[in-house]
From Swiss-Prot:
<dbReference type="InterPro" id="IPR007696">
    <property type="entry name" value="DNA_mismatch_repair_MutS_core"/>
</dbReference>
<dbReference type="GO" id="GO:0016887">
    <property type="term" value="F:ATP hydrolysis activity"/>
</dbReference>
<keyword id="KW-0540">Nuclease</keyword>
<feature type="domain" description="Smr">
    <location>
        <begin position="694"/>
        <end position="769"/>
    </location>
</feature>
<dbReference type="InterPro" id="IPR027417">
    <property type="entry name" value="P-loop_NTPase"/>
</dbReference>
<keyword id="KW-0694">RNA-binding</keyword>
<keyword id="KW-0378">Hydrolase</keyword>
<dbReference type="InterPro" id="IPR005747">
    <property type="entry name" value="MutS2"/>
</dbReference>
<protein>
    <recommendedName>
        <fullName>Endonuclease MutS2</fullName>
        <ecNumber>3.1.-.-</ecNumber>
        <ecNumber>3.6.4.-</ecNumber>
    </recommendedName>
</protein>
<dbReference type="GO" id="GO:0045910">
    <property type="term" value="P:negative regulation of DNA recombination"/>
</dbReference>
<keyword id="KW-0067">ATP-binding</keyword>
<keyword id="KW-0547">Nucleotide-binding</keyword>
<dbReference type="InterPro" id="IPR002625">
    <property type="entry name" value="Smr_dom"/>
</dbReference>
<dbReference type="Pfam" id="PF00488">
    <property type="entry name" value="MutS_V"/>
</dbReference>
<feature type="binding site">
    <location>
        <begin position="335"/>
        <end position="342"/>
    </location>
    <ligand>
        <name>ATP</name>
    </ligand>
</feature>
<dbReference type="GO" id="GO:0006298">
    <property type="term" value="P:mismatch repair"/>
</dbReference>
<dbReference type="GO" id="GO:0072344">
    <property type="term" value="P:rescue of stalled ribosome"/>
</dbReference>
Length: 769
């Protein structure tokens, strides 16, 4: 996108704020390099990565610590003979250690099914050989370990042994010669890999030896006694051997890094990328931002939008609801000076650029943005005295420069175009520009003070008007938008607010009256109505949110209580069944307890109803009815003349119900119920569906009995009195297993094979307690 337009929107300032949340300089540089993407898939994938990253941090509390920049290290390795020193290798192993810790923490993504984090992890191939080698050779302070090689171990052992010999000789010399008064300090030090004594300068001629150096003050000289010369020569040889061996080890470790260069660089990039993600999460917390998905061809629907650079300021900023449906391409904003028009336009452009760059934006969840591949901005005073360019000329030049580049994939921000010339001609040019934008399908947000352009916004198809509101009593801006209306410029009120002389204001008002341009009273009234409407809408939204919250809580409470009751009844039924199977209670007592447990679901009282029950003769097959006890609608599918009962289909559940519990339903409900049952009759019911009729055909006996057991639990909880079990004829083995199950179940009052016309010995009808 055009850098100049992003600069006008203050996009670089947002990147600078974002980079301040990074823990590394490399992460900060990566933030500063972010730019808008033009592919909806990439933008939405980045948004999803952010949301899943938020969930990861919320669940684990993981925080990435600081780590050093390694770009220079990788650049240094490009030359084949360069060898990394211990400090560079230590920085690398520490960074790789952090990357491994992060990698292990992110592995929770597989269990949580965070797909974008899994993709993030899959992109890293771990430099195991390099990491292991560095851990083996470097200690926790970054020094090369003695155990890095046998040769180094032996050399350092010799150095330590020689050091002990030197120390003993020096102590014996000091005490034997009684020269402690000649020394500045009673210790031995090292200069140029040689052990020396800190001798007071005025005593240097009294002892035999070599002076190697002097202190800054000149009061101390570093003196090597003659008895240490041979030992020091040996020490220098050992130190040289140590340096040679250390160089071999560093060369070896550098070779490991080179052999896994790509993996090391990828692990570092992995850490930098997560640093950027963490910065986005922290930024979102600071300004209350969310990730926004973009939809090609969608309209603008930004709820509670706030300018990100103002969102964290003291006192915050009033949120804006920015709306532009798909059938409208241009929003023209009018209203008072210093009323927030420019802030509104900047907010639209800046939030769009942020969203396209994968940066969370300060809006409410559920906000939607269309996709744009280009954003052009004309805003502010662009005059140049050096180039002899006025404000108006600069605007004209800018539009001329970008005009041929704008199409349906362009977002155009236009602030007070034509304001630097004759109002009539400026308004005409502005209308012509908007006409051209509409023809090219360009989406535009514009601000104006021109009355002609305000009228144009109200009457032109594809264009929408909006006004920034002001307080009717104080004339101060409210920084909120009212749609489908225009606003007054209230220039005189703004002048009065800023201390403009009253005498001049009075004359200005007289001139307005003389010119017939004083439409202020009408516009003020429109503003009052708009403010009132916005308050009413806010109150309605508040009440709606409160009611929805209350409803959700009640539904949640009801569901908890329902599950508790069902679980309790099921537990009671299982307890009764176990008591009966253990022989602790008889069949009749078990049946009584099951009946009592089942009655707790619906209670003893039947719901009151004004519906008059049918007589048995009034009921016809196919007739819609109302189950008075349950207040549920159904359709009659069968009648039992002997028991004076009716089989009713209620939403796919078929059950036998006494005729005196059925009544008529309203005409509209009848038609709807007949339609539903007719549709269901045309469709084959899926096998295994847990209703009051179960089909066990084709199943192994153990599987069938397990399903039948669960089916019984459901039937008892629903309060069923009749069951139909389809087991088929076949060899009769499944039927025998079903009957054995029924014989052992205390909830069964009796059972028999169905009549031939309803399945015969292929189905068993069961009567429950």
């Amino acid at each position: 996108m055009e850098p100049r337009s992003l600069q006008l929107l203050e996009f670089p300032k947002v990147l600078n704020v974002l980079s301040g949340h990074c823990v590394s300089t490399s992460g900060a540089e990566a933030c500063l390099a972010l730019s808008p993407m033009d592919d909806a898939g990439s933008i939405n994938s980045t948004a999803q990565f952010f949301r899943q990253g938020q969930n990861f941090v919320k669940e684990t509390g993981f925080r990435l610590g600081t780590f050093p920049p390694l770009e220079g290290l990788f650049q240094y390795l490009v030359k084949p003979n360069n060898v990394l020193d211990a400090d560079a290798l230590y920085a690398l192993v520490q960074t790789l250690g952090q990357a491994r810790t992060l990698k292990e923490a992110l592995e929770i993504a597989e269990k949580r099914e965070w797909d974008t984090i899994l993709e993030f992890l899959e992109g890293v191939s771990w430099p195991e050989k390099t990491f292991s080698g560095l851990k083996r050779c470097l200690d926790q302070d970054g020094n090369i370990k003695d155990e890095s090689s046998p040769e180094l171990y032996d050399i350092r052992q010799s150095i330590r042994s020689l050091h002990q010999r030197c120390s003993k000789k020096v102590r014996d010399f000091i005490h034997g010669e009684d020269i402690s008064r000649f020394l500045q300090d009673d210790f031995m030090t090292i200069t140029n890999d040689r052990y020396v004594l800190p001798l007071k300068t005025n005593f240097k001629g009294r002892l035999q030896g070599i002076v190697h150096d002097y202190s800054n003050t000149g009061e101390t000289c570093y003196f090597e006694p003659m008895f240490l010369v041979e030992l020091n020569n040996s020490m220098q040889e050992l130190k040289q051997q140590e340096r040679t061996e250390e160089l071999k080890i560093l060369t070896y470790l550098t070779g490991l890094v080179r052999s896994e260069y790509d993996q090391c660089e990828a692990a570092y990039g992995f850490l930098v990328e997560y640093d950027v993600l963490q910065a986005k999460i922290n930024f979102a917390d600071a300004v209350k931002a969310v990730a926004v998905d973009v939809q090609s061809g969608a309209g603008f629907d930004l709820r509670g939008a706030r300018h990100p650079l103002l969102a964290s300021a003291v006192g915050g900023v009033n949120p804006l609801n920015i709306e532009l449906p798909t059938d409208q391409k241009v929003l023209i904003v009018s209203g008072g000076n210093a009323g927030g028009k420019t802030v509104c336009l900047k907010t639209v452009g800046l939030l769009s650029a942020m969203a396209f760059s994968g940066i969370p934006v300060p809006v409410e969840k559920g906000s939607v943005l269309p996709l744009f591949k280009e954003i052009f901005v004309i805003m502010g005073d662009e005059q140049s005295l050096e180039e002899n360019v006025s404000t108006f000329s600069a605007q004209i030049q800018s539009i001329s420069r970008i005009w041929d580049s704008m199409d349906s994939s362009t977002l155009f921000i236009l602030d007070e175009f034509g304001s630097g010339t004759d109002p009539a001609q400026g308004a005409a040019l502005a209308q012509a520009v908007v006409d051209g934008l509409l023809e090219n399908g360009v989406t535009c947000f514009a601000a104006t003070h021109f009355p002609a352009l305000k009228t144009y916004a109200l009457v032109t198809e594809g264009v929408r008007a909006a006004s920034v509101l002001f307080d009717p009593s104080t004339k101060k801006p409210l920084f909120s938008l009212a749609y489908d209306q225009v606003g007054a410029s209230i220039a005189l009120d703004v002048a009065r607010e800023h201390g403009f002389p009253e005498s001049l204001l009075a004359k200005a008002e007289q001139y307005l009256l003389m010119e017939g341009s004083d439409s202020g009273s009408v516009m003020n009234r429109l503003n009052e109505l708009a403010v009132s409407r916005e308050k009413e809408l806010e109150e309605m939204d508040r009440i709606k949110a409160k009611l929805e919250s209350k409803r959700a809580k009640l539904e949640e409470k009801f569901e908890r209580e329902r599950l508790t009751v069902l679980a309790d009844v099921k537990k009671q039924a299982q307890s009764v069944l176990k008591e009966w199977q253990d022989g602790k209670i008889g069949r009749k007592q078990a049946l009584k307890k099951l009946s009592e447990a089942r009655s707790t679901i619906g209670g003893d009282e039947k719901p009151k109803s004004d519906v008059k029950p049918f007589s048995f003769d009034d009921i016809k097959v196919g007739k819609p009815i109302l189950n008075i006890s349950w207040n549920r609608k159904g359709v009659v599918i069968e009648k039992d003349e002997r028991k004076k009962r009716v089989k009713v289909d209620m939403d796919g559940v078929a059950m036998w119900i006494p005729a005196d519990q059925l009544g008529p339903v309203g005409k509209k409900a009848v038609q709807e119920k007949v339609r539903q049952v007719t549709e269901k009759a045309d469709k084959k019911a899926p096998k295994g569906e847990m209703t009051l009729k179960i089909d066990l055909r084709g199943k192994r006996a153990d599987v069938a009995i397990s399903e039948l057991d669960r089916f019984f639990d459901q039937a008892l909880l629903r309060g069923a009195t009749e069951l139909e079990i389809v087991h088929g004829r076949g060899t009769g083995a499944l039927r025998r297993e079903v009957h054995i199950f029924l014989d052992d179940n205390p909830a069964v009052a009796g059972y028999s094979l169905a009549p031939e016309d309803r399945g015969g010995d292929g189905m068993t009808e069961v009567e429950l307690v």
